[in-house]
Regions:
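Sparse recognition of residues in long alpha-helices and their boundaries
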Residues: 66-67, 94, 189, 216
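Short, well-ordered amphipathic alpha-helices
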Residues: 79-80, 96-97, 146
Length: 231
């Protein structure tokens, strides 16, 4: 999918204020930079991180990610998963990297179930490192990929679903301008109990309002540049 997007540019300069001796070399192509995190393409080497994340019971309960579920159960954590993801025209998967000395990715963010004709997609943001929680990384990653969705994919609406007990994720969505649009009663199951799933949505003009408010842009615009931050 990303290979077909000829107007995506790589940003090769290393993040500022990060000592070279503690910074992991970049992998993949940087798609978007914010003030706290940057988003890069999903590479085969990232399968090692996915292997670690899919066995985290806390992430499973808080996210219930179909992306991680498919990697573990449909592909048996195999290398073919990467090729399947990259050739899937209905999703864009990006890895979340944080500045200031982090030695591994802090999560993954994606737009999925992309409907180009109708102009809408679904958002999933997973912050996987407990040390990265409550630092605004998930909030900014969600903003950056939303801007990407508007600028590159041309979407006009983005939806997200969150378990009702994941208050932090709901607050993160609201900070990004999402509006609660409904509740799917007892649509989620955590292995023991059924839970409500809360539906959020945001429109293109609302995404643009957030961008103007926060002054965080895609490199394409300005060279300077279930959703989750678990509690």
């Amino acid at each position: 999918m990303l290979a077909l997007l000829g107007n995506v540019i790589a940003v090769d300069d290393p993040p500022l204020a990060v000592p070279a001796d503690i910074r992991r070399p970049d992998e993949g192509v940087v798609i978007s930079r914010g003030t706290r995190v940057y988003l890069r393409t999903f590479t085969r080497r990232d399968l090692a991180w996915l292997t670690e994340w899919v066995d985290d019971p806390y992430l499973e309960r808080m996210v219930g990610s179909e992306f991680l579920h498919a990697f573990k159960h449909d592909w048996d954590k195999g290398p073919g998963f990467h090729d399947a993801v990259m050739s899937d025209p209905t999703q864009v998967v990006l890895i979340v990297e944080a500045y200031r000395g982090w030695t591994k990715p802090v999560g993954v963010v994606r737009l999925f179930n992309i409907h180009m004709l109708e102009g809408y997609a679904f958002l999933e943001t997973i912050i996987t490192d407990p040390r990265a929680i409550r630092r605004g990384y998930g909030v900014e990653a969600g903003k950056l990929i939303s801007y990407y969705g508007v600028d590159v994919l041309g979407v006009r609406r983005i939806e997200a679903k969150v378990y009702a007990y994941n208050v932090l994720s709901m607050n993160s969505l609201r900070r990004n301008g999402f509006h609660q649009e409904g509740v799917l009663r007892q649509a989620g199951f955590d292995g023991t109990l059924y839970w409500d799933v809360v539906v959020f949505g945001i429109l293109k003009d609302e995404i643009e309002a957030v961008r103007k408010r926060d002054k965080v842009y895609l490199p394409l615009d300005e060279p300077e540049g279930n959703v989750i931050e678990p509690t």
